[in-house]
Amino acid sequence: MRVVVLGSGVVGVTSAWYLCQAGHEVTVIDREPGSALETSAANAGQISPGYAAPWAAPGVPLKAIKWMFQRHAPLAISLDGTPSQLKWMWQMLRNCDTRHYMENKGRMVRLAEYSRDCLKTLRASTGIEYEGRQGGTLQLFRTAQQYENATRDIAVLEDAGVPYQLLDASQLAQVEPALAEVAHKLTGGLRLPNDETGDCQLFTQRLAKMCEQAGVTFRYNTPVDKLLSEGGKIYGVKCGDEVIKADSYVMAFGSYSTAMLKGLLDIPVYPLKGYSLTIPVKEDNGAPVSTILDETYKIAITRFDNRIRVGGMAEIVGFNTELLQPRRETLEMVVRDLFPRGGFIEQATFWTGLRPMTPDGTPIVGRTPFKNLWTNTGHGTLGWTMACGSGQLLSDLISGRTPAIPFDDLSAARYQSGFSPSRPQHLHGAHN
């Protein structure tokens, strides 16, 4: 079968890889001159299934009001009055109760756990290297309340069979030795030993090369104008004067998926702007070993080989990609506070990207009302964490195989009134 994949970020390239491995003839189309040059370029570097959780959570509406008056707030909102922004925010607010939070987090963890298993298999079969580490993730708490709140997430982890360690402040240095110097600022941490890290862009670009060697065609520098449809099917992709045709089409344009599907399918994917710094390591024993997640500022600090990646924050500002100095100052403040000897911060590279976020936090992966159009988008801040599992899942569906995990509640159909999954959507499917 001929399949066109729209988008060459980590989600698009992993989709292409698994489709190619399933025997399909795959073409990837992207407006950029290469793969992983937008949202996948400089993310936080975490592969953290256990921390997969929606931004829509109990208490977030009140926190958002408080954050409006804080200099180093993790979330910023700039209302532009557009219907798409207002509708998306309203849908997000409706997901901020405990029932929705647990339901959404459950399916996110299910897909993320499966994705890590898929990445492990891919790594073993290809030998791909991307400055990856398997040292786990450590979520740091600065208040007693944060430490107590961790018990809510632990319940989901236990249900999913995810190993964890709840540590007090005196135990943090056993996992991350450099934290011994700042333990007095912290109340404890939640460690997930099975989490991983790695350079998402490096992985994506190397996997794209492997895709090419396996026969995948990449059409870079090719902006897409629209999808052409007739009779409940897509019959082509219009790129300037050219129409590229295939048997099936995969939408993996990230935040731009919503506009590209306008008139065909209404999906609630909205850009969530994030920032990162990439810092050369200064003192090895003053830098992190793996990944730190600062719960207060929602900022991740990840160790690559000779670099530290500091990423986080969320701005609901539409498609604005301006680099704001106050955001850089927040990233610098957090890394200086936790790892004062870790890196040459003055040499850091500053970056911003648009994460494609759904109001319930779960990506939109699967079928659409058009029988040959599929979506793989809306992964938010977890594209790197969920990419391999999403790609394998989509390849299985397109190939007519039954996926290894429950999938009905991952497609756009879940936003339709009266939707109910056709089979139990349990967490343990990730380990089947």
Swiss-Prot record:
GO function term, MF aspect, one: D-amino-acid dehydrogenase activity
Annotated residues for binding of FAD: 3-17
Function, in words: Oxidative deamination of D-amino acids.
Gene Ontology biological process terms, A to Z: D-alanine catabolic process
SUPFAM superfamilies: FAD-linked reductases, C-terminal domain, FAD/NAD(P)-binding domain
Cleavable signal peptide: none
Record flagged with keyword Transmembrane helix: no
Species the sequence originates in: Enterobacter sp. (strain 638)
GO cellular component, one term: plasma membrane
Pfam families: DAO
Co-factor requirement: FAD
Gene responsible for this protein: dadA
Pathway in which this enzyme or protein is active: Amino-acid degradation; D-alanine degradation; NH(3) and pyruvate from D-alanine: step 1/1
Catalytic activity: a D-alpha-amino acid + A + H2O = a 2-oxocarboxylate + AH2 + NH4(+)
Gene3D superfamilies per UniProt: D-Amino Acid Oxidase, subunit A, domain 2, FAD/NAD(P)-binding domain
UniProt family annotation: Belongs to the DadA oxidoreductase family.
Protein name: D-amino acid dehydrogenase
Enzyme Commission no: 1.4.99.-
PANTHER family in the record: D-AMINO ACID DEHYDROGENASE, SARCOSINE DEHYDROGENASE-RELATED
The organism's place on the tree of life at top rank: Bacteria
Cross-referenced InterPro entries: DadA, FAD-dep_OxRdtase, FAD/NAD-bd_sf
EC primary class: oxidoreductase
Keywords: FAD, Flavoprotein, Oxidoreductase
